[in-house]
Amino acid sequence: MATLILKQTLIILLIIFSLQTLSSQARILRSYRAVSMGNMDSQVLLHELGFDLSKFKGHNERRFLVSSDRVSPGGPDPQHH
């Protein structure tokens, strides 16, 4: 009797979890060619995923905090192998 109840419970749980995965909401990225090419800008990607860039706090200000003229380091440290 206990094994029958256990089997029924497991079947019900399996049905509940499978129904939950069927109702999951995932976004489909329509611009798959641009992503596969590797030349997609992050802002374009966020827009394609449905995010409103104007609602991000300070997304334009952060761009000006980073200097665009980066200098490469002087080479490997002679103290390390």
Curated annotation (Swiss-Prot):
Sites carrying sugar chains: 76
Residues the record lists as Hydroxyproline modifications: 73, 76
GO terms under cellular component: apoplast
Record-level Gene Ontology MF annotations: receptor serine/threonine kinase binding
GO biological process, one term: cell-cell signaling involved in cell fate commitment
Keywords: Developmental protein, Differentiation, Glycoprotein, Hydroxylation, Secreted, Signal
InterPro entries referenced in this protein's UniProt entry, alphabetically: CLAVATA3-CLE
Superkingdom assignment: Eukaryota
Signal peptide annotation: 1-26
Similarity annotation: Belongs to the CLV3/ESR signal peptide family.
Family annotation (PANTHER family): CLAVATA3/ESR (CLE)-RELATED PROTEIN 7 (PTHR36016), CLAVATA3_ESR (CLE)-RELATED PROTEIN 5-RELATED (PTHR36016:SF1)
Official protein name in the record: CLAVATA3/ESR (CLE)-related protein 5
UniProt source species: Arabidopsis thaliana (Mouse-ear cress)
